[in-house]
Amino acid sequence: LGLDQIEEDGDFYRLGAMVSLRTMERHHGLNELTQGAMEESLRHIVGVQFRNLATVGGSLWGRFGFSDVLTLLLALDAQVELHHAGRMSLEEFTQLPRQQHDILTHVLIPKGARQVVYQSQRNISTDFPTLTCALSKKDGEYTCVIGARPQMAQVYRDEKGLLSGGVTEETARAFGEDVAQRAKFGSSLRAGEDYRREICAVLVRRGLLAMEKEG
């Protein structure tokens, strides 16, 4: 079935659900597409042995709050293929009831040109993240995804047009604060709600400035 393979299918990279996180981390095409964000999002996850066993399908199906994988793939406008329900956006998939009688078979990542940055805050390097942040820019439109809130990752867009005039220190700070106020955070053993809100604004600002510098 090729469920452990990464294939190029027209305008997409098509990943079987059994592709390991380590395979994604080391894949030249995916890293070139994301300017290294793919490797950055995966390299902190526990250890190489674990990443050789953990799969992209399991990471997405669980819709775990701490998922680095889900955070980045939402920013990439990824799609999923389900055996019964067919193809849908990953963002739509995250809204489905968790008790789905279906099977996730493939993940599709669009090849279109975009800028991507991934950042996370961890108490120690291989721990679950305290907060995750993925930013992408395509055709002048910005997408921000915040995960480990500690709930499941959510997508936030520039609804107020704060970045319409370009990214500067001031606009990056304003957008970071806007996302931090719109996002819903909670407390867990790793961090409190207020701490996560503060970190969110910082990661978004840093990510935007890094993206602007690389662009």
Show where each model-derived region lies:
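C-terminal structural segment of proteins
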Residues: 1-215
